[in-house]
Amino acid sequence: MPRKGNIPKREVLPDPMYGSKVVTKLINNLMVDGKKGKSQRIVYDAFAIVAEKTGEEALEVFNKAMDNIMPVLEVKARRVGGANYQVPIEVRPERRQTLGLRWLVKYTRARGEKGMVEKLAKEIMDAANNTGASVKKKEDTHKMAEANKAFAHYRW
């Protein structure tokens, strides 16, 4: 553990096409083996499909999707007297975004469509309509937190 205090976080630069830091984070999450150009092309092509199919601004649809994916509560294991309890805690804003992006990419990869562009576009549109696997993951996380509400007093 470092003794010199906190290490400053590196600032994420907004992406060149939409000027959004969240889109940059999506591109970075999607990137495999350092191939950022390929990842950018996938995201921008998917956004083009989203804009074409919904008739709305792609960034607005993406932001709506992110709002529907990001969790408010999660559970954290806490050991008390030899027993492990799943303690519900609120999710910090930065972690909410990180989890939302992580789930979006994970469930995009798990989809059955042909081609990553199509998968990502469909998952974003589904999430914007409050359906899809990534939204289900958020709902499951919230259900888990709700079910373990009794252990909320173990919060630290």
Swiss-Prot record:
Q: Which domain of life is it from?
A: Bacteria
Q: Name one GO cellular component term.
A: small ribosomal subunit
Q: Which GO terms describe its molecular function?
A: rRNA binding; structural constituent of ribosome; tRNA binding
Keywords of the record, alphabetical order, are: Ribonucleoprotein, Ribosomal protein, RNA-binding, rRNA-binding, tRNA-binding
Which GO terms are recorded in the biological process aspect for this UniProt protein?
Answer: translation
How it assembles, according to the record, is: Part of the 30S ribosomal subunit. Contacts proteins S9 and S11.
Name the NCBIfam families on file.
rpsG_bact
PANTHER family named in the record: RIBOSOMAL PROTEIN S7
Q: Which family does it belong to?
A: Belongs to the universal ribosomal protein uS7 family.
State the protein's purpose. Answer: One of the primary rRNA binding proteins, it binds directly to 16S rRNA where it nucleates assembly of the head domain of the 30S subunit. Is located at the subunit interface close to the decoding center, probably blocks exit of the E-site tRNA.
Question: What name appears for this protein in its UniProt entry?
Answer: Small ribosomal subunit protein uS7
Q: Please give the organism.
A: Clostridioides difficile (strain 630) (Peptoclostridium difficile)
Q: Which gene encodes it?
A: rpsG
